Amino acid sequence: MECLLVIDSGYSHTTVTPLFNGRPLHRAIRRLDFGGKHLTNLLKEVISVRHFDLHQDTKIVNDIKEDVCFASMDFKGDLERSWKGSKSRQKDKAVKDKDKDMDMIDKLNDGEVRVDYILPDGVHLLRGFSRPHDATVTAAKKRKQTALSSASLHNSEISMTLGNERFSVPEILFSPSDIGSKQPGLPDMILQSLSVLPPLLQATMLSNVLVVGGNAKIPGLPQRVESELRSRIRTEWQVRVKTMENPITSTWLGGARMANKFPSVVREYGVTRAEYLEHGSAWTARRFLNGGSGKGP
């Protein structure tokens, strides 16, 4: 018995598809209408309000998302750590001098969340990059940028400090209600998908979960999915969530291997270019649902 639960989180949406003996169980497929573009757009709004207006710079924001965003394993804890720097700056200087050791610990903990991101200038730096947050350097640069004239500003390094933006943006995959959506989060959607299957299949599917798509590259996302599922299911069930080395191309590679190993299946389910141009994408969907070339629309 071959069971696989595929979570495909791509550009436009996220789908949960249980596979049994290589075939999708259509009645159990679920879709979450959030994908990579929604994360990028949300990050764009947050950065434009807090830092710089990047509404017209989708590519830059997408790079920022790929460079620094992560799925939090402890949302409340990370949220507190992201604010430690701003709180510590409000302390009296004498108290800071007295508690240098504690201040150092705060900085170390804070550095796990906050980073400084250097924006590209389009001339000398074509892609931005991140580095560990340094409050003293950041403050000095802000004073320098304020003193610079608009004519010479482009010659300076432009940076911004990112804190809770790093993990609050990917959080909408787990809590869509944060931005007003009534859809369930990814863990709940997975359980909804499995709820229509027999218990034996549910347990087997949970022990073989595969995350693919561009969002699978978000650090911590597979681990967060596994942690959320463990907290929601029977204690005797095993949960294993894995991802491919390159989750973006893994779907294509799987199709290529299937075409090479099972050419008869490709001939049965494949749609020619002429058929697609004549009937459109609906022909492809019905071909798969009806089980082959002899049972088209």
Where are these regions (language model features)?
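C-terminal region/appendage detector
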Residues: 1-297
